[in-house]
Regions:
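N-terminal Rossmann NAD(P)H-binding glycine-rich loop of SDR-like oxidoreductase domains
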Residues: 5-25
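Conserved internal alpha-helix in NAD(P)-dependent oxidoreductase domains
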Residues: 71, 90, 94-101, 109, ...
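Rossmann-fold cofactor-recognition segment
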Residues: 45-56
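Active-site Tyr-X1-5-Lys
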Residues: 142, 149-179
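Conserved Rossmann-fold NAD(P)-dependent oxidoreductase catalytic core, especially the SDR/UDP-sugar
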Residues: 101-155
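NAD(P)H-binding glycine-rich loop region in Rossmannoid oxidoreductase-like domains
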Residues: 55-95
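C-terminal substrate-binding subdomain of Rossmann-fold SDR/epimerase-dehydratase oxidoreductases
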Residues: 212, 216-333
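NAD(P)-dependent short-chain dehydrogenase/reductase
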Residues: 11, 129-138, 168-223, 229-234, ...
Length: 333
Protein backbone atom coordinates (compact mmCIF):
# COMPACT_ATOMS: atom_id res chain seq x y z
CA UNK A 1 0.00 0.00 0.00
CA UNK A 2 1.34 3.43 -0.94
CA UNK A 3 2.14 6.05 1.66
CA UNK A 4 -0.36 8.86 2.03
CA UNK A 5 0.41 12.59 2.02
CA UNK A 6 -2.01 15.10 3.55
CA UNK A 7 -2.05 18.34 1.54
CA UNK A 8 -3.75 21.53 2.73
CA UNK A 9 -4.80 23.94 0.00
CA UNK A 10 -4.65 21.12 -2.51
CA UNK A 11 -7.22 22.62 -4.90
CA UNK A 12 -5.38 25.92 -5.17
CA UNK A 13 -3.21 27.40 -7.90
CA UNK A 14 -0.07 25.80 -6.48
CA UNK A 15 -1.67 22.97 -4.53
CA UNK A 16 -3.25 21.40 -7.61
CA UNK A 17 0.21 20.89 -9.10
CA UNK A 18 1.58 19.58 -5.81
CA UNK A 19 -1.19 16.97 -5.70
CA UNK A 20 -0.40 16.04 -9.30
CA UNK A 21 3.33 15.70 -8.58
CA UNK A 22 2.76 13.57 -5.47
CA UNK A 23 0.41 11.24 -7.34
CA UNK A 24 3.02 10.88 -10.07
CA UNK A 25 5.54 9.94 -7.36
CA UNK A 26 3.26 7.08 -6.33
CA UNK A 27 1.74 8.55 -3.17
CA UNK A 28 -1.89 8.48 -2.17
CA UNK A 29 -3.10 12.02 -1.48
CA UNK A 30 -5.69 13.50 0.85
CA UNK A 31 -6.36 17.12 -0.13
CA UNK A 32 -7.90 19.41 2.49
CA UNK A 33 -9.28 22.67 1.12
CA UNK A 34 -11.93 25.26 1.94
CA UNK A 35 -13.37 24.71 -1.54
CA UNK A 36 -14.34 21.70 -3.63
CA UNK A 37 -13.42 23.55 -6.84
CA UNK A 38 -11.20 21.17 -8.82
CA UNK A 39 -11.29 23.18 -12.05
CA UNK A 40 -7.48 23.44 -12.06
CA UNK A 41 -7.13 19.67 -11.92
CA UNK A 42 -9.91 18.10 -14.02
CA UNK A 43 -7.54 15.31 -15.03
CA UNK A 44 -7.17 14.23 -11.39
CA UNK A 45 -10.81 13.96 -10.33
CA UNK A 46 -11.27 10.66 -8.55
CA UNK A 47 -7.51 10.13 -8.23
CA UNK A 48 -7.22 11.63 -4.73
CA UNK A 49 -9.32 12.12 -1.61
CA UNK A 50 -10.95 15.56 -1.41
CA UNK A 51 -11.76 16.87 2.06
CA UNK A 52 -13.53 20.21 2.49
CA UNK A 53 -13.14 22.27 5.64
CA UNK A 54 -11.69 25.34 7.32
CA UNK A 55 -7.99 25.38 8.22
CA UNK A 56 -8.94 27.48 11.25
CA UNK A 57 -10.82 24.50 12.69
CA UNK A 58 -7.97 22.86 14.56
CA UNK A 59 -10.06 20.02 15.95
CA UNK A 60 -11.23 19.09 12.45
CA UNK A 61 -7.72 19.22 10.99
CA UNK A 62 -6.33 17.07 13.82
CA UNK A 63 -9.14 14.53 13.50
CA UNK A 64 -8.72 14.14 9.75
CA UNK A 65 -4.96 13.82 10.01
CA UNK A 66 -5.18 11.34 12.90
CA UNK A 67 -7.63 9.18 10.93
CA UNK A 68 -5.37 9.02 7.86
CA UNK A 69 -1.94 8.63 9.49
CA UNK A 70 -0.07 10.28 6.60
CA UNK A 71 3.68 10.03 6.10
CA UNK A 72 3.85 13.82 5.80
CA UNK A 73 1.74 16.97 5.72
CA UNK A 74 2.28 19.56 3.00
CA UNK A 75 0.82 22.86 4.17
CA UNK A 76 -0.13 25.29 1.40
CA UNK A 77 -3.47 26.66 2.63
CA UNK A 78 -3.28 30.44 2.99
CA UNK A 79 -4.99 33.68 2.16
CA UNK A 80 -3.21 35.47 -0.68
CA UNK A 81 -5.31 38.65 -0.57
CA UNK A 82 -8.11 40.35 1.30
CA UNK A 83 -11.25 38.26 0.61
CA UNK A 84 -13.58 41.25 0.94
CA UNK A 85 -11.19 43.71 -0.71
CA UNK A 86 -10.51 45.55 2.54
CA UNK A 87 -7.87 45.06 5.26
CA UNK A 88 -8.73 42.35 7.77
CA UNK A 89 -5.58 41.59 9.78
CA UNK A 90 -7.30 39.20 12.18
CA UNK A 91 -8.58 37.02 9.36
CA UNK A 92 -5.19 37.02 7.62
CA UNK A 93 -3.35 35.95 10.76
CA UNK A 94 -6.06 33.48 11.82
CA UNK A 95 -5.72 31.66 8.50
CA UNK A 96 -2.06 32.15 7.63
CA UNK A 97 -0.55 31.76 11.09
CA UNK A 98 -3.28 30.04 13.10
CA UNK A 99 -3.70 27.53 10.29
CA UNK A 100 -0.01 26.67 10.47
CA UNK A 101 -0.27 26.15 14.21
CA UNK A 102 -3.25 23.85 13.64
CA UNK A 103 -1.27 21.82 11.11
CA UNK A 104 1.66 21.41 13.48
CA UNK A 105 -0.66 20.36 16.30
CA UNK A 106 -2.32 17.88 13.94
CA UNK A 107 1.09 16.43 13.11
CA UNK A 108 1.72 15.76 16.80
CA UNK A 109 -1.76 14.32 17.41
CA UNK A 110 -1.51 12.16 14.29
CA UNK A 111 2.10 11.10 14.88
CA UNK A 112 3.15 12.54 11.51
CA UNK A 113 6.94 12.67 11.21
CA UNK A 114 7.28 15.49 8.67
CA UNK A 115 5.67 18.82 7.78
CA UNK A 116 6.58 20.69 4.59
CA UNK A 117 5.60 24.35 4.84
CA UNK A 118 5.22 26.60 1.81
CA UNK A 119 6.86 29.87 2.77
CA UNK A 120 7.72 32.78 0.49
CA UNK A 121 10.26 35.34 -0.61
CA UNK A 122 8.08 37.78 1.33
CA UNK A 123 9.70 36.36 4.47
CA UNK A 124 12.72 38.53 3.59
CA UNK A 125 10.71 41.75 3.80
CA UNK A 126 12.71 44.49 2.09
CA UNK A 127 16.07 43.13 0.99
CA UNK A 128 19.02 45.46 1.42
CA UNK A 129 22.57 46.07 0.25
CA UNK A 130 23.94 44.11 -2.68
CA UNK A 131 20.86 41.87 -2.64
CA UNK A 132 18.68 44.82 -3.65
CA UNK A 133 18.43 46.62 -6.98
CA UNK A 134 20.38 47.18 -9.15
CA UNK A 135 22.81 44.34 -8.36
CA UNK A 136 20.32 41.65 -7.21
CA UNK A 137 22.94 39.45 -5.58
CA UNK A 138 21.20 36.15 -4.73
CA UNK A 139 19.66 36.16 -1.26
CA UNK A 140 20.70 33.28 1.05
CA UNK A 141 18.37 31.77 3.62
CA UNK A 142 20.36 33.52 6.37
CA UNK A 143 19.58 37.02 5.07
CA UNK A 144 17.44 39.24 7.29
CA UNK A 145 15.76 42.12 5.45
CA UNK A 146 14.05 45.21 6.76
CA UNK A 147 10.38 45.07 7.81
CA UNK A 148 8.05 45.77 4.89
CA UNK A 149 5.65 48.73 5.18
CA UNK A 150 2.21 47.90 6.55
CA UNK A 151 0.19 46.17 3.82
CA UNK A 152 -1.23 42.77 2.98
CA UNK A 153 2.20 41.75 1.67
CA UNK A 154 3.81 42.58 5.00
CA UNK A 155 1.16 40.61 6.92
CA UNK A 156 1.64 37.70 4.53
CA UNK A 157 5.40 37.84 5.10
CA UNK A 158 5.04 38.17 8.88
CA UNK A 159 2.85 35.07 8.98
CA UNK A 160 5.36 33.12 6.89
CA UNK A 161 8.28 34.06 9.16
CA UNK A 162 6.25 33.30 12.28
CA UNK A 163 5.10 30.01 10.75
CA UNK A 164 8.71 29.05 10.17
CA UNK A 165 9.44 29.87 13.80
CA UNK A 166 6.56 27.69 14.94
CA UNK A 167 7.87 24.81 12.86
CA UNK A 168 11.40 25.08 14.21
CA UNK A 169 10.07 25.07 17.76
CA UNK A 170 7.82 22.08 17.13
CA UNK A 171 10.82 20.27 15.65
CA UNK A 172 12.85 21.05 18.78
CA UNK A 173 10.03 20.07 21.15
CA UNK A 174 8.66 16.97 19.43
CA UNK A 175 11.32 15.81 16.96
CA UNK A 176 9.27 16.19 13.77
CA UNK A 177 10.97 17.21 10.55
CA UNK A 178 10.01 20.69 9.39
CA UNK A 179 11.05 22.02 6.01
CA UNK A 180 10.05 25.54 4.96
CA UNK A 181 10.38 26.37 1.27
CA UNK A 182 10.69 30.06 0.43
CA UNK A 183 9.44 30.45 -3.11
CA UNK A 184 10.34 33.14 -5.60
CA UNK A 185 7.55 34.84 -7.56
CA UNK A 186 5.45 31.97 -8.87
CA UNK A 187 4.04 31.78 -12.40
CA UNK A 188 1.14 29.34 -12.66
CA UNK A 189 -1.85 28.60 -14.90
CA UNK A 190 -5.03 29.77 -13.21
CA UNK A 191 -3.27 32.35 -11.06
CA UNK A 192 -4.78 35.29 -12.91
CA UNK A 193 -8.33 34.03 -12.43
CA UNK A 194 -7.78 33.10 -8.78
CA UNK A 195 -5.40 35.84 -7.57
CA UNK A 196 -6.19 38.77 -9.84
CA UNK A 197 -4.18 41.23 -11.96
CA UNK A 198 -1.25 41.31 -9.50
CA UNK A 199 -0.35 38.06 -11.28
CA UNK A 200 1.68 40.04 -13.78
CA UNK A 201 3.33 37.16 -15.63
CA UNK A 202 -0.02 35.46 -16.12
CA UNK A 203 -1.36 38.75 -17.48
CA UNK A 204 1.45 38.86 -20.01
CA UNK A 205 0.97 35.27 -21.15
CA UNK A 206 -2.81 35.31 -21.36
CA UNK A 207 -2.97 38.70 -23.07
CA UNK A 208 -0.37 37.39 -25.52
CA UNK A 209 -2.54 34.36 -26.24
CA UNK A 210 -5.51 36.64 -26.93
CA UNK A 211 -3.61 39.25 -28.92
CA UNK A 212 -4.36 41.92 -26.31
CA UNK A 213 -1.59 44.48 -25.67
CA UNK A 214 -0.23 44.73 -22.13
CA UNK A 215 1.13 48.00 -20.79
CA UNK A 216 3.09 48.68 -17.62
CA UNK A 217 3.83 52.34 -17.01
CA UNK A 218 6.95 51.55 -15.03
CA UNK A 219 9.26 48.70 -14.09
CA UNK A 220 11.34 48.05 -17.18
CA UNK A 221 14.54 48.16 -15.12
CA UNK A 222 13.26 45.91 -12.33
CA UNK A 223 14.46 42.33 -11.96
CA UNK A 224 12.96 39.46 -10.04
CA UNK A 225 13.29 35.71 -9.63
CA UNK A 226 10.44 33.81 -11.31
CA UNK A 227 9.70 30.13 -10.70
CA UNK A 228 7.20 27.98 -12.56
CA UNK A 229 4.62 26.07 -10.57
CA UNK A 230 5.87 22.68 -11.76
CA UNK A 231 9.25 23.50 -10.19
CA UNK A 232 7.41 24.52 -7.03
CA UNK A 233 5.76 21.09 -6.98
CA UNK A 234 9.07 19.40 -7.75
CA UNK A 235 10.74 21.08 -4.77
CA UNK A 236 7.90 20.12 -2.44
CA UNK A 237 8.03 16.53 -3.65
CA UNK A 238 11.74 16.45 -2.95
CA UNK A 239 11.20 17.86 0.54
CA UNK A 240 8.62 15.15 1.21
CA UNK A 241 10.98 12.37 0.12
CA UNK A 242 14.41 13.61 1.22
CA UNK A 243 16.45 11.60 3.72
CA UNK A 244 17.51 14.86 5.34
CA UNK A 245 16.18 15.35 8.87
CA UNK A 246 15.51 18.20 11.27
CA UNK A 247 14.32 21.73 10.56
CA UNK A 248 15.50 23.68 7.53
CA UNK A 249 14.62 26.63 5.32
CA UNK A 250 15.20 26.36 1.58
CA UNK A 251 15.00 28.95 -1.19
CA UNK A 252 13.26 27.75 -4.34
CA UNK A 253 13.41 29.70 -7.59
CA UNK A 254 15.51 29.86 -10.73
CA UNK A 255 18.26 31.73 -8.94
CA UNK A 256 18.53 34.26 -11.78
CA UNK A 257 17.20 37.78 -12.37
CA UNK A 258 14.51 38.36 -14.99
CA UNK A 259 12.69 41.47 -16.14
CA UNK A 260 9.23 41.85 -17.63
CA UNK A 261 10.86 42.41 -21.00
CA UNK A 262 12.54 39.00 -20.73
CA UNK A 263 9.15 37.38 -20.16
CA UNK A 264 7.63 39.43 -22.98
CA UNK A 265 10.36 38.23 -25.34
CA UNK A 266 9.66 34.60 -24.44
CA UNK A 267 5.95 35.17 -25.05
CA UNK A 268 6.65 36.82 -28.40
CA UNK A 269 8.66 33.78 -29.46
CA UNK A 270 5.49 31.74 -28.85
CA UNK A 271 3.05 34.41 -30.10
CA UNK A 272 4.89 36.71 -32.54
CA UNK A 273 2.10 39.29 -32.52
CA UNK A 274 2.09 39.76 -28.75
CA UNK A 275 2.62 43.36 -27.60
CA UNK A 276 4.00 44.38 -24.21
CA UNK A 277 4.95 47.95 -23.40
CA UNK A 278 6.98 48.52 -20.23
CA UNK A 279 8.00 51.97 -19.06
CA UNK A 280 11.36 52.69 -17.41
CA UNK A 281 12.13 52.52 -13.71
CA UNK A 282 11.33 50.00 -11.01
CA UNK A 283 8.43 48.42 -9.11
CA UNK A 284 6.18 47.19 -11.94
CA UNK A 285 3.66 45.89 -9.37
CA UNK A 286 3.54 49.30 -7.66
CA UNK A 287 3.85 47.83 -4.18
CA UNK A 288 5.88 50.81 -3.02
CA UNK A 289 8.91 48.98 -1.63
CA UNK A 290 11.69 46.63 -2.67
CA UNK A 291 9.73 43.37 -2.89
CA UNK A 292 11.87 42.07 -5.75
CA UNK A 293 14.88 39.80 -5.34
CA UNK A 294 16.79 36.81 -6.63
CA UNK A 295 17.10 33.73 -4.42
CA UNK A 296 20.22 31.70 -3.75
CA UNK A 297 18.97 28.17 -4.46
CA UNK A 298 22.26 26.35 -3.79
CA UNK A 299 21.14 24.88 -0.45
CA UNK A 300 18.02 23.32 -1.98
CA UNK A 301 20.22 21.95 -4.74
CA UNK A 302 22.75 20.44 -2.35
CA UNK A 303 20.35 18.99 0.23
CA UNK A 304 17.19 18.25 -1.78
CA UNK A 305 18.60 17.74 -5.27
CA UNK A 306 16.41 20.58 -6.53
CA UNK A 307 17.19 22.08 -9.92
CA UNK A 308 14.72 24.25 -11.88
CA UNK A 309 13.47 22.57 -15.05
CA UNK A 310 11.49 25.46 -16.57
CA UNK A 311 13.18 28.49 -18.06
CA UNK A 312 11.00 31.29 -19.43
CA UNK A 313 10.39 29.63 -22.79
CA UNK A 314 9.46 26.30 -21.20
CA UNK A 315 7.33 28.16 -18.66
CA UNK A 316 5.31 29.93 -21.36
CA UNK A 317 4.92 26.76 -23.42
CA UNK A 318 3.71 24.63 -20.52
CA UNK A 319 1.42 27.38 -19.22
CA UNK A 320 -0.34 27.64 -22.59
CA UNK A 321 -0.55 23.87 -22.92
CA UNK A 322 -2.04 23.56 -19.43
CA UNK A 323 -4.79 26.09 -20.14
CA UNK A 324 -5.67 24.25 -23.32
CA UNK A 325 -5.50 20.83 -21.68
CA UNK A 326 -7.72 21.80 -18.76
CA UNK A 327 -10.17 23.86 -20.79
CA UNK A 328 -9.32 27.11 -18.97
CA UNK A 329 -10.19 30.20 -21.00
CA UNK A 330 -7.44 32.85 -20.98
CA UNK A 331 -8.44 36.21 -19.51
CA UNK A 332 -7.73 39.65 -20.93
CA UNK A 333 -6.58 42.09 -18.27
Amino acid sequence: MSERIFVTGGCGVNGSWVVRDLLERGFEVSSFDHSSDTSLMPDLRGAFELLVGDIRDGALVSRLVHQRKPAAIVHLAALVGYPQGRPDPKLVYDVNLGGTLNVLEAAIVGDVPRVVFTSSKSAYGVVTGAHARPTYQPVPETHVGLPAPASFLSMYGHAKVAGEGLGFNYCAAFGIDFFALRFATICAPGKLARHGPMSVHSRLIENGMLGVPTTFGQGGDERDDIVYVRDVAQAIGRAVTTSHRGAEIYNVGQGRPFGLKDMATAIQRRFPGAVCNVGPGYDFMKVGFGAYNVLDISKAGAQLGYAPQYDLDAMVGDYVAALERFGITPMAS
